[in-house]
A protein has these predicted regions:
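Phosphate/diphosphate ligand-binding glycine-rich loop within oxidoreductases
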Residues: 33-138
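Alpha-helical scaffold segments in soluble metabolic enzymes
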Residues: 16-20, 86, 107, 132-139, ...
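Short loop or secondary-structure boundary microenvironments that flank
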Residues: 7, 98, 120, 154-155
Length: 171
């Protein structure tokens, strides 16, 4: 399953994801015993998103391949598609991508067979952060109905604000 934006998910899907996240927070264990590999492909600097995905993979018993564009063939012109295909070819089971190009995933849809999770695309979307924000709101209030949420900051350029606005108006 790819996660590019939250537009692709129904409210029931979102609630199911949040329910499962809560189960993990409360101690649910899954251990792939190092048999699954997640490649974290970060084309922009990141601390929280990058290492949160790294820690999540660790908690699931997965191994990670941490990629940094500045130390790769991207510097010689390698495309995002070629980079993802490489990680697919060496047996990675999924990729998490943070990329400066808005809607970068359009270049991958239907062309790669492993799941792609967006860790942020340009000023477009940041679905994983939005899911975290939704989980926090649900933990604090127990529901979404009737809440008035204010998003502050540079909302024009904020991929998190875009994702939050997109999903919160549907809740």
């Amino acid at each position: 399953m790819n996660i590019f934006t939250l537009k692709d998910f129904s409210i029931a899907d979102i609630n199911q994801i949040l329910d499962e996240a809560e189960e993990f927070k409360n101690g649910k264990k899954v251990d792939y015993h190092g048999k699954k590999v997640v490649a974290n492909l970060f084309f922009e600097p990141s601390t929280r998103t990058h290492y949160s995905f790294d820690k999540a993979a660790y908690n699931l018993g997965c191994r990670t391949q941490n990629f940094e564009a500045g130390n790769s063939s991207v510097q010689k012109g390698e495309t995002l598609y070629d980079t993802v295909k490489f990680f697919e070819s060496i047996g990675c089971d999924a990729v998490v991508i943070r990329h400066p190009k808005e809607n970068y995933f359009d270049d991958l849809i239907g062309k790669v067979s492993i799941p792609v999770v967006s860790g942020g695309d340009g000023t477009g979307n940041h679905p994983s952060q939005s899911l975290l924000d939704l989980m926090t709101i649900r933990e604090e209030f127990g529901h979404f109905e009737g809440l008035k949420i204010v998003i502050v900051g540079d909302i024009i350029h904020s991929r998190v604000a875009h994702s939050n606005f997109e999903i919160m108006q549907r809740l």
